[in-house]
Amino acid sequence: MHILTRSSKNAFPRSRSRQDIHISSHIHRDTSNSALLKILVITRTRLDSFVKT
């Protein structure tokens, strides 16, 4: 799984880095557990769908 996520990040470095910055800014704004869980679920579902396709 780690290898797949790394390769996907390398395949789209610009879009991925922008997403990471956007997610990190949201974490800094709202550090509540519910917000963090939502972000984790969203990113995990995105990665899973990306790996499947």
Swiss-Prot record:
A GO cellular component term found in this entry reads: peroxisome
- Compositionally biased tracts (Polar residues): 1-10
The protein's superkingdom reads Eukaryota
Q: Give me the ranges of the annotated region Disordered.
A: 1-25
Protein name in the entry: Uncharacterized protein YBR072C-A
